[in-house]
Amino acid sequence: DVVAKSDWVVPAVVPAILEDVLGPVLPALRDKIVVSIVSGWDFARYEAFLAPGTHHISTIPNTPIAIGEGVLACESTHNLTEAEYAQFEETFGKIALIVPVTAAQFGPAGTLGGCTPAFTAMYLEALGDAGVKYGLSRAAAYQMAAQVLIGTGMLYLESGLHPGVLKDGVCSP
């Protein structure tokens, strides 16, 4: 019933149960746009599973999408029409940087974009812990560390300078 009333379907389940979840509604997906965020399900795998003619694109998001600052790797091979893809970009571009990649790059891009928030949180925690060790309050240390990460990322994005140049531009190591 939900699928019948929807223009888009966004499967967001663990890979092991995707076939069980979508199987019963496969015929209803033919006139929908399927935007998958299921890990390990690329264009070729969906083509073999979905009803012929179903329009779909595979993506891998990351958790900062929750605040409109995410990264969304999307497989450049898809069968959305030009208008559907423009609608996809318009919709998801509001919450993420959309990075089209080839099928061969889809796994690594998903890992980089999808897993890096966890590594960054660990780094943020370590920076904060170091600040606490040397006398800063935990709140101040985490706030400073978070702003340094944001600022450095924005400096890179806005300047276009290689990260090594940014690193070398710091006066003290």
Residue ranges of model-derived segments:
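Internal alpha-helical scaffold of NAD(P)-dependent oxidoreductase catalytic cores
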Residues: 45-55, 71-109, 119-161
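Rossmann-like NAD(P)(H) cofactor-binding subdomain of soluble oxidoreductases
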Residues: 1-74, 78
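Alpha-helical membrane segments and immediately flanking helix-loop junctions
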Residues: 112
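Small-residue helix-packing motif on alpha-helices
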Residues: 2, 18, 137-144, 166
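Short beta->alpha linker loops
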Residues: 13, 38-41, 104, 147, ...
